[in-house]
Amino acid sequence: MPSYNAAKFIAASIQSVIDQTYSNWELLITDDCSKDDTVKIVEKFIVEDNRIKLFSTGKNSGPACARNKSLENATGKYIAFLDSDDIWVSNKLETQIQFMIEKNIAFSFSSYSVIKEDGTPTGNTINVPRIIGYHGYLRNTIIGCLTVIIDREKTGNFIMPNIKSSQDMALWLLIMKRGFKAYGLQNTLACYRLVSTSNTSKKWKAAKDVWKVYREIEHINPIYSAICFIGYAINAIIKRL
């Protein structure tokens, strides 16, 4: 879990991990030099639960660096992702890991609901396909980072590309290029929080960052990039209906 000035929401995010029906977890939080009470809040949880560990980037470096610090210190075979303002449903880990074991798969994700900044439901649920591969994902970035679990004993070790935005998209594509598809559970296992920064300008920036992933990370030619981007834009609109 990366954190930066997350004092308003991080307690709820941490509590959603503590409340999991699956108990064999470790929560690795890397703080990116927060200026609020984020660290103090995390430290209070650590006193009560030694499965929670806190690291620091040392200097403000962005979410990719924070996530990678946690990845470097993770000891488990399953890697799950959660941002400091989002929430897991209590049976998320148990349900998803059992699904992965039964299907013998390396990369899974799930449907998730969207909540308002105050935690109340918006009524919007993002429903996911049962399976998606590299070319499908280029056109439909449907995978919510907060829902992903990866078996790194199957995929091999990985880090998030150190880019300013869309690091998760770039990582999923990297893993897919290793020959793995992502398998979706229709169960709604997480809640994505819409915060005040989730505005039109941020969405426009996210769209530009997706284009950068096509051209600068994946090195896709302009024509195919345009085709993929049209698919991305259409699916982004559908996702918000």
What are these regions (language model features)?
Residues 16, 23, 31-40, 59, ...:
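A conserved acidic beta->alpha catalytic loop
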Residues 91-122:
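Conserved donor NDP-sugar-binding/catalytic core segment of glycosyltransferases
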Residues 57-74, 95:
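Glycine-rich, basic loop-to-helix element that forms the pyrophosphate-binding segment
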Residues 9-11, 33-44, 87, 91:
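Acidic helix N-cap motif at the loop->helix transition within catalytic regions
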Residues 79:
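Short aromatic/hydrophobic "clamp" motif used to bind/position activated sugar donors
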Residues 6-19:
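Short, well-formed alpha-helical segments that are part of the catalytic scaffolds
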Residues 83-87, 111:
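The conserved acidic donor/metal-binding loop of glycosyltransferases
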Residues 72, 124-205, 209, 213:
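Conserved nucleotide-sugar donor-binding catalytic segment
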